[in-house]
Amino acid sequence: MLSLTIKGKARRRKERAFGDRDFLTFSSKTKKTENVNLSFEKGTRFFDRGGMIFGPSPRSARWPIGIAAFGLCLLFLIKNSGSARESAGNNRKEGVHVAAASAPFLVNRAAGSATTTKERIHFKITNASAMAACGMAGSDLFGYIIQVESGVTGTAGLMENNFHGSVQRALFSLRILRSLRVNSLARIQNFWGPSIPSSSPAKTPLPFGLNIFFDSYMWAPDIYEGSPTPVTAFFSIAPERSISANILRVFIYGSYGATLQQIFFFCSIALRLRSTGAMANEGKASSSIGQLDYGGLYFVLVLMWNREGIQSLLIGLFIYASMDDRCFAIVSALRQTRVKYIADLGALAKTNPISAITFSITMFSYAGIPPLAGFCSKFYLFFAALGCGAYFLAPVGVVTSVIGCWAAGRLPRVSQFGDRRQFSVHRTRSLPNQLRHGWECMLRKIGSSLIHQPSVYSISLYESTITTRDEPWFGEFELALGVIGLPVTAHDRILRCSPPVVGTTRAGPGLNSER
């Protein structure tokens, strides 16, 4: 076994539209009588590991949509504060008792002479459950702190991401509860206009549709940076289900046969954005966004007071929750092998065939391929939409679902036919513990000072994966490693060290090896 000191220097270089890539240049020193030279070609690049399996949506898509939705939300909150007071004053003149307009974000629980105790209890439960849903959406901070303390991931963008995601979700849920108010005369009180009798269709304002279908892009598990942990699974599944259930309960009272062309329009736009954005985002977050866009179609059917639409919503939520649980369970079970990035799924069919088959079936169900459960939910949804007269929206959903199959099929393809490529130098006894911990702490310190998501590069030193970030980190490092065998492959210019072969030292083409 050869003892070797490897020096490395990191630099950054931009490459067209594919983003920035880190390059490492190595040199070596010989020690005593062991004369081994190991050198890479100048500018040798680590392979691209792909995005994270549970990675967030691209910032290029999140930020414009999030800023636009948040700005519209603030503008119409200011507008509503004046219109709500005016509407409340008109109602007092007419003798209609409503809740004070100065109390924002509350469902009207004020009871007139015709309001029953059962109605009061129902709206109290609705308000309490909505607050619980928003609290769960805002409690992401606790789950994230748990992960940071356990060393799963770290980032300086903790407060920025947590504020951005939690506030958007809370405002989204609370505005829905505020936009539809039910008074004692069983009339729909709209903050953007006068009271509407129950026999007439309810108006759905423009910002309401924007909040529904544009804020859904903020529901992806952004703040977790794709960490496949049980905490991530809970806080990414439970708030969505809770908020969806509360929206359903409120929308049933605000429907009464409305034909909502605005929501049809924004739902079709959201479906198209999801199908095209998923091609850029390789992770499961695109599947989460897509299911929420189909959830917008569910709520359109509920607003049209369609019984099949309500049934399809409940079936779709149940099936999607089960697929989420299964997908997180599979990836969490593979945490011991450091499966976090898409490239880590390579050769999973050889090492763990049962998990690979289950994971592939789950992702195909996300895509809606028959005869899996995901196809059944979408089939039920599209036929319910056709039965309600949504002859334009249903074909759009079918086409975008077919386009989304390409993105959902990438993970099964890598797990079944991919090759696990990794720059690895297995640990030997010649690697001191102090040096090993120092190297790990250096990377952790570098990573925690960055805002962007983890990079796609890794170095495996002692049967684990240490990742750098997609940000420039400059400097030199020096490691004393026991080189067991020099690399045997040079197709991707990756250094691999295999178990020792007695009396042999192997080197791949493109690398110089001397004894």
UniProtKB/Swiss-Prot annotation:
Membrane-spanning intervals of the chain: 63-83, 250-270, 299-319, 356-376, 379-399
Pfam family, one: Proton_antipo_M
Family statement: Belongs to the complex I subunit 2 family.
Lineage: superkingdom: Eukaryota
Its biological purpose: Core subunit of the mitochondrial membrane respiratory chain NADH dehydrogenase (Complex I) that is believed to belong to the minimal assembly required for catalysis. Complex I functions in the transfer of electrons from NADH to the respiratory chain. The immediate electron acceptor for the enzyme is believed to be ubiquinone.
Cellular compartments annotated: Mitochondrion inner membrane
Originating organism: Beta vulgaris
UniProt-listed InterPro entries: ND/Mrp_TM
Lineage: Eukaryota, Viridiplantae, Streptophyta, Embryophyta, Tracheophyta
Membrane topology qualifier: Multi-pass membrane protein
Catalytic activity: a ubiquinone + NADH + 5 H(+)(in) = a ubiquinol + NAD(+) + 4 H(+)(out)
Record-given protein name: NADH-ubiquinone oxidoreductase chain 2
Enzyme class, broadest EC rank: translocase
